[in-house]
């Protein structure tokens, strides 16, 4: 297994299929996030998200983001700081097999757990009406408490099949939107 995005694509690696693509792409995203900030630590976007710099698909442009890969194998929590009434803060966990867990809204300490693997990818969103200074102070007040700090590891992947499947799925996107409209991501 590998712990770096630079090692992810290898000849002889696991073949990507349409069925395993969500998990394979999630592994790639976890490795890239872990390269930006070590496990159980945040990588914060200190400015509102630009349309030309989106590490994940369809990020909101009116949101400050913080990302973390958390080892939950020894138990873990995230604490979000207090925000004024009417302001927005949330955390969304994503499992290693790309299951989007229920979001938690507002300040508080939240338990982190997964049904699959040992790690979660956390996406924390902050209201765009905060000034950069306010948002950065809130980001710095976020706390991850984890009983283990093992880095995420993934099986190496064959790049040729990964690219072919990804391109095939992208080509089908127009068809899916035409069929399902705004609900293309549901179900």
Predicted features along the sequence, with ranges:
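A compositional/structural signature for long, glycine/proline-rich flexible linkers
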Residues: 2-187
